[in-house]
Amino acid sequence: MSRSVWKGPFVDSYVLKKAEKSKESGRNEVIKIWSRRSTILPQFVGLTFGVYNGRKHIPVNVTEDMIGQKFGEYSPTRTYYGHAADKKAKRK
């Protein structure tokens, strides 16, 4: 079920404040955020966010294609190492 249109996109207030400060300063620093649930807005295009995945901050460069999606979609929380090899088959 998608979010109601009249509510608008959800963005944590501190993410908006950090993005505004970064744009005003003009420096292209990584903005560390913990809000994976926040929606990517058009004013974030061109900025780099460090999205926390539970262990470290993953740098995410925001492009126009990402608008309307969540930050958490670009910071995977699980690492897949593949299935373990069968030791019996290896021995032969």
From Swiss-Prot:
Please name the GO terms of the biological process aspect recorded for this protein, alphabetically: ribosomal small subunit assembly; translation
Identify the keywords attached in UniProt to this record, alphabetized: Ribonucleoprotein, Ribosomal protein, RNA-binding, rRNA-binding
Q: Which Pfam families match?
A: Ribosomal_S19 (PF00203)
SUPFAM superfamilies registered for this protein in UniProt: Ribosomal protein S19 (SSF54570)
Sample GO molecular function, one term: structural constituent of ribosome
Say if the entry is tagged with keyword rRNA-binding: yes
A GO cellular component annotation here is: small ribosomal subunit
Answer whether the UniProt record assigns the keyword Ligase to this protein: no
Q: What does this protein do?
A: Protein S19 forms a complex with S13 that binds strongly to the 16S ribosomal RNA.
Family per similarity comment: Belongs to the universal ribosomal protein uS19 family.
Q: Identify this protein by name.
A: Small ribosomal subunit protein uS19
Q: Which organism is it from?
A: Jannaschia sp. (strain CCS1)
Q: What would be the name of the gene that encodes this protein?
A: rpsS
